[in-house]
Amino acid sequence: MKEATELNEDMLEEAEHLALLEPEDDGTFFQVTNLLNIMDSESAKTDTTGPGLDMRKTLASVIITEKATTDPCVVMNALIRCLQMPEISTQRKMNIYNIMQEIIQQEGEMEEHCIQRLVAIASKQMRDITEAEDFETAEVASETLVALSRNHFSLVMYELQHHLKPLNLTDEFVIVTLAKLANGNVFEFMPYMGITLATIFTMLRLANEAKMRQVICSAMETFCETVQFYLRHLEDSLYPVMTEDQFAVKLFPMYRYFVTVWLRHQDLEVKLGVIKSLRPMLSLLLPNDDLREQVYDYIPLLLAEFQGTGHWPLFPSLLQVLRQILEASVTTNTPIPPMLLHPIFTELHVQVCSKAPAQQQFSSQNLMEIVHCFIALARSYPKELMKFFFSQVEMSKEAVRVGTLALIRAVVSADDPKINIKTIYLAIRVVKNTLSDTRSKVRMAILRIIGQLVLSGFQEKIKGWGLKYVSVQLTLSTYKLTNRRECFYQRDLEEKMVHKVTMDTVKIITSSISGMTNEFWVRLLCYIMETDYTEALTPICISLTNLAENQIHGKDTEAGIAGKSKHVDLPAPQKLLARLLVLMSSPYKGEGRGIAMLNLLRTLSQSIAPSMADMWEQEIPLLVQYLEEHTEFTWNQKTWEDMLIQFLRNSLKKTRGTSWSLRLSKELNNQIETFDSPSLEKGFLYRALGFTLGMGLEADRVEVLLLELLYKTDYSNDFDREGVILCFGLCARGQVKTVLNVLQDFEERIQESEQSWQIGAWRKDHPWRRETVKSALMVMYSCVSSYCHPQMLLTHVDSPITSKIIHHYSSSCQDISLKMAFMKSVVQVTNAIKSIQDPEDFQFAHKSALTGLIVVIIKAEPPDHLVSPVRSMAMDALSQLSTMKPFYSPEESTELMDISIHTVISLQPPGEDNESVKTLYANTMSSLKQLMEGLLQRQLDPKGLQDTVHLLEKWILSEKEWEREKAMALHLHLMQIYVQSIGVCIPLKLGQFGVLVGLIAPCTCDAHRRTRLASINVLSSLLDLHVSQTCSLWGTSKEQELQKCKEDLQDTDMNKISSASSRVAKVVCPEFNCDEVVSLIQKLCENIGAMDLQHDRAAVTWIGIFLQMRVKELEDKVAEILGAILVHLPVVDHPEVRRHLIEGILLLAHYHQETVLTSLLRQPLPMESHLTEVWLAVAENVPFARTMLHGLLGRLQSRFTAKINATSKADIWRLAAVDPLMTLCTIQLLMEKMDQDDKFPDLFPDLLYTFLLQLGSSHGPEAASPVLKTWRLVHTGPLPQEMTLQRCSRSRITIKSMQLLVKRINREPLEQALEEQSVWSLLENGGTFLEGVSLMARLCMQNMENYMQRLAELVLTGMGSEILSCCISSTAICVEFMSDPVLHQEKLLRPVVLMLEKGAGQDKDETLQVLSLRALGNMALGAPRKVKQYRKLLLEKCLGSLQGQVSSSAMAEGMEALTKVLAELREGDIGSSFEAISKQCRAFFDNESELLRLKAFVLFGKLTKVVGISKKHFFKGEVKRGWVSLLLHCQDPCPSVAQACVATMFQCVHFWGWKSLESSFGHSNDSINEQMTVFQTNMCSVLAQKKPAVLCGFLLETTVFMKNNLSRIRIAACNLAGIIMKQLSAHYLKKMDLVGLRNSLQDLQLDSDAGVRRAALETLKVLDSCNQHWLLASPRGLP
């Protein structure tokens, strides 16, 4: 009940403090609110845009703070009021609290009531945590309370203590704030410390959440640190004093609870918090004697934490706690219970020795904590600890032993007086127990302990076992390192570490121990002589030098040396000198062993060779000085080796006359197998050996050593092989004959031949390969030539040296190594020959053979990649051979150039990351340049230059940029050499300059910068050469402009590059003559398409510039230029490039039209796309296109005109023969593509007429005359197929062109009429062509009156042409013109008639004759009034066509023409021609030709109308003579003939005077045959009465027609005969040959036609009837 009352009071008090304040100053409140709003808005902006906008927020905060300086209470109340506003954001709360903290720090006076309200509000918001954001509010509220505590501690502490109640788990921020108060107000907090700790202790059982436990642990850590601070500053405290023991007593229960309960919590964060709080607790607990032992009791619980899974983050803090306890036990001399020692030993030892996972491994700091723990244990419990260590090393685990030895080393190294000698003794016992362990880490640990013992002052403890162990390890590690295997890399690394530790130990020992045993001296000296592992030689040499100096000066009595002598015990002097010389060849290995060895050599000089001692005293310091002045990065190997060789030479001079040098040679020879290959030491060894052998005086013993060296060399090892070769070369300097004898002897001994090669018998470890030995022998011979005396060289160079080289190469498999050896040998031999100052005109006999072999080698190399230096070496060899006599011929030089260029330039460039290939690549290119230069020097003339450039051309034009770059670089190099060498001596050939420039001009726009620069430099060189040879006015301004262009070509912008290239073209153009321009353009055209688009653009740009600048001067060269362009235009793919070339053609055509036109028209058909593009470009320019169209028309018309003689070059081209089909195609294309608004008013007649002529010519002049009314031309024989196809194609193109022409003039009636009447089909067909011409002419006359005059003029001209087809076509047109008044109106009738007269009078062509006759006849239609004027001519030509050997077509046309003409004449106009016409006409009545019969009957009918009185009697006789024919042909099988015959017959009836018969035909409905029967019956009746004799004559004529070819005529004849016999009297019948008539009729009974047989039978019946009638009428007895 009491607690409830207190709770209610607290709530009422809190509610009172939290009640909303009444506003004291609304202005301040609103101002503060506005400023807080600004801060909130700026905070939102800052979250999204960054801290750049935080200025306004800070300014608002500063304004509120500044206002609080004058009136803090008002501002604070306003802030408190804002803090109490509902739904306030967390950010605003934080801003308010931060401002409050700043106001509180100002130390202004505030009312206590205000402070109380602030404390209450902050305390409440600090404790009200419901969401994650509330933690931030609680934190700033806590900070505000801490800030208030500085001036109002009691109020704040009262509030916090008010909420800290026993057995009641408070809020976490209450404890956090209490910890902060304790840390910030130590002395003020101390009175509350006891009660605070006691209250918190009561909460421990209630704190089940991990977070709360962490807070309490952190608070306890702070509280303990505060107590320690308080205890250290007790004198400054004003509060009641609380002793350390009192604090310890209060803390221990919490310590116990933490260790026993909370430390076992599963949360690692809780564990870590507990352990961190233990250290400050132990600082207060361990000084207390009573509590210390109780702390010891809880050590097992701490040790247990080392065994937890995943507890590795706790280990650092745990180790610190354990170390704190152990060190306290040492300082207080309070031993830990013995039962706890072994667990502590074990747990700590395990942490050192176990192989924990990577994330659990200790840092060096943690390891030091453990070491300090063991040191503390060693101080108090040395015997127990060493006993534990001994038990651990008894185990075989490497990690355990290494860890244990490391801990022993730490104990030994501890500088602590409490660790006595007994402890060291015990430790050494433990170490000795591990000496037999061979594992690397154990050995290193033991060596480190030995070194540490020396460093710690226990040298005497290692003199026995320690030195021996070090010596053994030095030997053992060296052996293992020199015999290591590649598959045991890890083991080798460990062994290296062992060796390093061993060397460090040796260094420590030799620098720390005053005395040394003789055994150790011997071991170290033998180590230098025998070891193959040379990395440790430097410290060993230094140690030996120090020891030797001690021995020499008698300072080391233990060594057993007298001390007065300067000699020490050494192996063989030559052996030691050889060893040290070889090792000194790499002076900076092993930390600078060279200086150490030189000092050792100087120290031992008296012992090695007393005769050399004085010289060594002078020269060794110089060698040392050189090494000291340089480093491993600055020294020069060759210089150093030369210094050593000179040192050796000077040393050997001191022993001249003795066998010292020979013994040294043997030792050097023995040393060869002790070094690896390759190595600097072994290389120097071969050099020293060769030099030493060369100085030997006993040739036989030198031969033995050389032969031994040859046998034991591993020739498969490149380094050894080269070393032996160098050795033999150096030896040959003084022993050339000996060396050659040895080589020959070696070859004989190994039985060197093509059938037997048994070398492997001497080398079982490294079986020799035949090729490797052969390559070595080749280079040995060449090396001998390089080093031997010049006079001896000329004696031996051909034989045996060169001959042996060729033999060994030719008899081998010729792999890469052999090839390289062979070419190396060739170079060495040639260099050796060239080095002779006076070769006495030496002729190298084997030059040709060597060249052939090298060429084969080059050709065998892969073409696209570089795999070896074979190419480079081969070209170097050829370069050297080219200088030898006899020199190469020009053909041989060209062939060598071509082979070399091809094998190098085709190579792909190396990658950027492959330096070795890049070097190989550069060397190969350099060798090629050198070879090309050498060969070019032998042919320095234009031909040689052109041949060389020709070889480079295909590479300069390559699509691969690396090939272009290399080729251009080589071109530049050779061009510079040529210009420098030849100058103005020999001018270039005509056109050569243009070819050379045309080749490289496009490369000025190459995408690769180096190629562009090389090309412009080549161009500059060519210009320099050209200007110097032609004395051209090449000025400074041009040179400057060219230089600017070069600079611009280095740009990366392709537009600038193209512009620069164009400027270059303009600069150089004036330097070209016309021939050079042609050659340039030809070369540029030839190379278009060979590279990329940029090059093609550059090429056409250059062409355009040259044509623009020089076109007027190129009249004689147009055909060549145009030909070059047209030849290459088809292969140009890119439209832009094609357009530029076409523009060049148009430019040429503008100035030289005839030449260009002829060249274009002479291109073959079908028209290619490139030609189409040219003409399309022409069509775009209408004026120019019309000009070209005129020219094309002229070309077509010239075929039909008389030939004229050319008076100019333009005439020659204009009159040149061209393909008319090509011309037609071109005209059609232009008409189709030209501007549609151009109607061709001036060209229409010419075009139309020309097209018609072309059609006529395409159908051929071989056609026969047309058949009347069909216009079909009948060819006399089949045309060849090719000609037929061409003519058909020409016809179609011509017709299409005519259609385009008609469509363009926009005359729809004409166009429609042509389509409706199928004129185009008629024109296309050769058989109907003339009919189509007539229709075309007729329609044009009807629709195109304006053009008739011009067309008539053209027709007149064409009729006079010598070309038959032209005459025929023109005459066909004239046929229509003659039927129209146009000719008469244009006063062209007379010349036309004269032309027609000529055509009608000729007999060579039937068609022309027919058309001429037709045209003459049409005069009656077009100019009827002129017929009388030309009647004589007309009658003559028409009548002439009816006489003589004339075709039926001409006869028919003649009769038709007469029919037309007679219509306009009278009898008097005809004159005597009437009789001839009548007779000729009647003669065709019975003609086989229907056409002729038709025309004859029509003409005869026309004559009946013309005949007058004077000719009537004559014509009556003609009618009588032709009457039977008329009667019979009225039944002609041809209807038109029968009709014409009937009409003519009735026109002739009136000449008989039979008016009654004129109207007897055609007035009944009977058939024609029936009407004719009636007519004939009536006629015969009349004649029988009036003129029976005439009727008898008709019967006789009728009998003749019974044999006519026409069946209808035979029928008609039978019928007419029957009619006549019926009408004749018996008197007249008796006079007739009736027997003959009967026979004829009987013969007709066998006729194939049934109608004839019936008609004959009927007539026979009539005949029999007549006979019977005659018999009855006659008297009896009379016949």
Curated annotation (Swiss-Prot):
Gene3D superfamilies: Leucine-rich Repeat Variant. Pfam families: HEAT_Maestro, HEAT_Maestro_2, HEAT_MROH2B_1st, HEAT_MROH2B_C. It comes from the Eukaryota. Keywords: Repeat. HEAT repeats lie at residues 68-91, 92-128, 190-229, 293-313, 314-350, 380-417, 422-459, 571-610, 614-654, 737-774, 848-887, 991-1028, 1219-1261, 1387-1425, 1632-1669. This is Maestro heat-like repeat-containing protein family member 2A. It comes from Mus musculus (Mouse). The lineage of its organism: Eukaryota, Metazoa, Chordata, Craniata, Vertebrata.
